Amino acid sequence: MSKLLVVVDYQNDFVNGALGFEQAAALEDPILNRVQTALNDGWKVIFTRDTHSEDYLNTREGQFLPVPHCIENTSGWHLYGKLAQYESESCPNMMFVNKPTFGSEELPHAACTLCGGEPEAIELCGVVTNICVVSNAILLHSAFLSSSVSILKDLCAAPNPEDHESTLRLLSGMGYGIV
């Protein structure tokens, strides 16, 4: 069985763009190191990309969060910093999932495809802990009842550290590993 690392939305707009925040920038090297280690150890890696179109403000999410961001194929949509190298690399153990909102209903199917079935273990990291990380963690936890699902707490961030911590407590209470 495969092990899976999911890097959630580590994109320019969440680090130094429209919705950027200081804590996100500090994650660049630690996330890069985790991705490199995972690939070297034979893990599968999925990068999610928040992906919107020009009509974002007319969507339900755009009404809730009226800040245009991660418009497909703009600079803000691409992975941030050193992680951007993976967008131009071809690797059989890696894939991208473009998602139109906080959580991706396609993520479990993508994980099965990449892993050749249900992953044995899943780790998540990225941003924003209390929005997209938690949404995708719950989708994966619900889809893979035999998989351990863990959040890499030091490789996730939210603009408000209290939101980050309260989300980790919530996930811990639902049986997720917080490592």
Question: What residues fall within each predicted segment?
Answer:
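Active-site acidic carboxylates
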Residues: 1-95, 116-117, 150, 159, ...
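Histidine-anchored nucleotide/phosphate-binding helix
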Residues: 31-37, 134-143
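Short phosphate-binding/catalytic loops that engage adenosine nucleotides
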Residues: 43, 145, 176
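Acidic, Mg2+-coordinating phosphoryl-transfer loop and its flanking beta/alpha structural elements
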Residues: 142-151
